[in-house]
Curated annotation (Swiss-Prot):
Source organism, top-level taxon: Eukaryota
Organism: Homo sapiens
Crosslink position(s): Glycyl lysine isopeptide (Lys-Gly) (interchain with G-Cter in SUMO2): K302
Lineage: Eukaryota, Metazoa, Chordata, Craniata, Vertebrata
Region described as Disordered: 1-34, 53-243, 259-494
Matches recorded under InterPro entries: BNIP5
Residue ranges, compositional bias (Basic residues): 145-164, 282-303, 427-449
Compositionally biased intervals (Basic and acidic residues): 10-20, 111-129, 173-184, 233-243, 304-313, 382-393
The keyword DNA repair appears for this protein: no
Name of the protein in question: Protein BNIP5
Biased composition (Low complexity): 63-79, 409-422
Length: 652
């Protein structure tokens, strides 16, 4: 079988090659087994083929045959080939350039391709041999293979068919030459650009225009590329570690940034935990001072608020005095029915009142010290005493409310009776008057409380020195209810003696604030003023009346005399109202007791009118009916002559 890479050559070609064999540097019988090739950098379009004259000179045949004619037809024109070298060098140069083109095609990946027409015209019997392309085919091989093909089949083809095939092969060769020329130009440009990138230092000072591209071809087909290709590979190998180093640096930078971010997050979390820590004591006190000022400005008048603010500012320096004064800023009762008192009356306030305060030297009320009063401030009251104290306060407040309601009802009733006597009205009009009177009762206290601060302000403008002791008189009464509002400050400094209200309704004149230790002896205490004496007398009367009216309250006061101090929180007018109410209750209870005792002996009054006769007046006196029935209704004078008449029969 014929080898596609080594086709059978004619005898004339072998003789021509034998003449040039001493000049070629080949090792074997054929010149293309192993050669050292040198390619100039500039591309060339010279196609080295054997012409007709060369065949005639080197061959021993007498005349050129049809094969020479076909070879001549397949050879390129002189314009394409250009100047030819001497005939002695042509075989070696042909093989060199053929190998060079095949290697360039191998690098550029543009191998020679046969046209489809030529492949389709091949006989079917030899498709298995020639179906693979021949990438390592030399430039002169198509013509030689064409000649051998015509030698084998001279009888099958005619001359016209040979001419047509020669034209087709010529066109295919031209196309292949153009493609190879373009590939060579691209390869040369790539080599020049690579040499320009390497520079004179890496290429060893050699000129890029005269640098050769050496290829060593062994019989096995191994290739050894020149230093330019190795330089590109070394450059790529040098660039790769740089990229790895850059990637490693980026990774390290990211690690550093991540560590820094974690540290910042940890610091931020620590700061966030440290921020909600409690503020300093000074800041807390300033905040409490602001809240206390807001409360006093809403509930109390401006003057009272300014004094409390001054007191609060003074207490900031002494933190020990701050907690007991917290309760003094509780708001007053504005619309309720009970005065605003501290929620810690039963537990904390008795201790605060019993605590000795040596700073205030004002005299206090003359209350004899008792063992229960001389307790230490650190002792805690038992729960039963605290509950009793709360019950006592509630009862006193309810009694005071009843007293004010009774007093408020009496005056409108008197006015209504006077109007009813002067102008008698029908029953429906009386009902409307009763409704109006109920409205008058509701707004009665509101009118009086609004008048009192005005009068107090007018009276205090003339005497500025008296404004300070008149401070508690500005505290309004419970507007919506019927109970007086107690002082919101329950400290020992605010316990003051008050004088009773004058007849014309002027505000109470308050003396100096008493604050004296309960354990002190009354001998060393200064003499009390008339206002304090009058208030103490009122309190004593009130205690006595409470013992008479309600035995439970009397027992509580006897067991715990310290409960009397609660009465010092009320004004004199409130205490006087409470005393009057208790007196009326005592009188009413005594009358009820007498009536109950007398009702056992009561009988029908008509019987007295019928049978008593002249003794009816005496009967009324004896039976105790003088208070409830008017004795003038008995017809004493008119019935006296009828007694002697014989028609009247005595019950006897």
């Amino acid at each position: 079988m014929e080898n596609p890479r080594c086709p059978r050559r004619p005898l004339a070609e072998k003789k021509a090659r034998s003449l040039d064999r001493p000049q070629a540097p080949g090792k074997g019988s054929e010149s293309w087994d192993c050669h050292w090739l040198s390619l100039p950098t500039a591309p060339s379009r010279k196609a080295l083929h054997w012409t007709t004259s060369d065949w005639a000179r080197h061959s021993d045949s007498p005349a050129p045959s049809a094969e020479a004619h076909c070879t001549t037809a397949a050879a390129p024109t002189p314009e394409e080939t250009g100047d030819f070298l001497p005939s002695e060098q042509r075989p070696s140069q042909d093989t060199k350039k053929g190998w060079l083109k095949t290697m360039l095609n191998f690098f550029v990946r543009t191998g020679p391709e046969e046209p489809r027409e030529k492949a389709s015209r091949r006989p079917r019997g030899k498709e298995g041999i020639s179906q693979h392309p021949e990438p390592l085919e030399a430039a002169g091989e198509p013509a030689l293979r064409k000649k051998a093909h015509h030698d084998k089949k001279p009888s099958r083809k005619k001359q016209g068919h040979k001419k047509h095939a020669a034209e087709v092969t010529k066109a295919a060769q031209d196309q292949e030459a153009r493609g190879r020329e373009e590939g060579l130009s691209k390869a040369a440009a790539a080599l020049r650009s690579g040499e320009a990138d390497l520079g004179p230092a890496r290429r060893g000072g050699e000129d890029s225009d005269h640098q050769s591209f050496l290829i060593k071809v062994d019989g096995t087909g191994a290739l050894d590329v020149s230093p330019h290709a190795t330089g590109h590979q070394q450059e790529e190998e040098l660039k790769k570690p740089d990229q790895d180093a850059i990637i490693q640096m980026i990774v390290e930078l990211l690690k550093r940034v991540g560590d820094q971010w974690e540290e910042e997050q940890s610091l931020a979390s620590q700061l966030g935990v440290a921020l909600p820590n409690p503020a300093p004591a000074v800041r807390k006190k300033s905040q409490e001072k602001k809240t206390s000022l807001k409360r006093t400005s809403k509930t109390n008048p401006k003057k009272h608020g300014s004094e409390e603010a001054k007191r609060g500012a003074a207490d900031v320096s002494s933190p020990e005095a701050w907690p007991p004064k917290k309760s003094s800023f509780l708001p007053l009762c504005v619309s309720g029915h009970r005065p605003s008192i501290s929620s810690s009356y039963g537990l904390e306030e008795p201790k605060v009142q019993e605590a000795p305060s040596t700073e205030a030297g004002a005299p206090g009320p003359s209350v004899l010290p008792t063992p229960s009063e001389s307790q230490e401030p650190g002792e805690e009251l038992p729960l039963d005493r605290a509950s009793e104290y709360k019950e006592f306060i509630q009862k006193i407040i309810s009694m005071l409310q009843d007293a004010e309601e009774q007093q408020g009802e009496e005056q409108p009733q008197v006015q209504q009776e006077e109007v009813g006597v002067e102008n008698p009205a029908p029953h429906c009009r009386r009902k409307s008057q009763e409704k109006r009177s109920s409205f008058r009762r509701a707004f009665y206290h509101k009118k009086h409380t609004s008048k009192e601060p005005r009068r107090a302000g007018a009276a205090g403008a003339a005497s500025p020195e008296a404004r300070r002791p008149k401070r508690p008189s500005f505290l309004p009464l419970c507007v919506g209810g019927h109970r007086p509002s107690t002082s919101s400050s329950l400290d020992p400094e605010d316990l003051e003696c008050r004088e009773p209200l004058p007849a014309e309704g002027e505000p109470v004149v308050i003396s100096e604030a008493p604050s004296q230790a309960r354990g002190h002896t009354p001998e060393g205490a200064p003499q009390l003023s008339g206002a304090c004496e009058s208030k103490e007398i009122i309190i004593q009367k009130l205690v006595a009346l409470l013992q008479e009216v309600d035995g439970q309250l009397g027992q509580q006061i006897r067991r715990h005399p310290s409960f009397k101090r609660f009465f010092y929180e009320f004004s004199d007018s409130s205490l006087s109202k409470l005393v009057a109410t208790l007196r009326s209750q005592v009188a009413h209870s005594s009358k009820l007791d007498r009536n109950r005792a007398r009702r056992l002996y009561q009988f029908d009054v008509s019987l007295a009118n019928k049978f008593a006769g002249s003794n009816s007046h005496a009967m009324c006196i004896l039976m105790g009916l003088r208070d409830h029935y008017n004795c003038t209704q008995f017809p004493y004078r008119e019935d006296q002559p009828n007694i002697t008449s014989p028609k009247v029969e005595s019950p006897d």
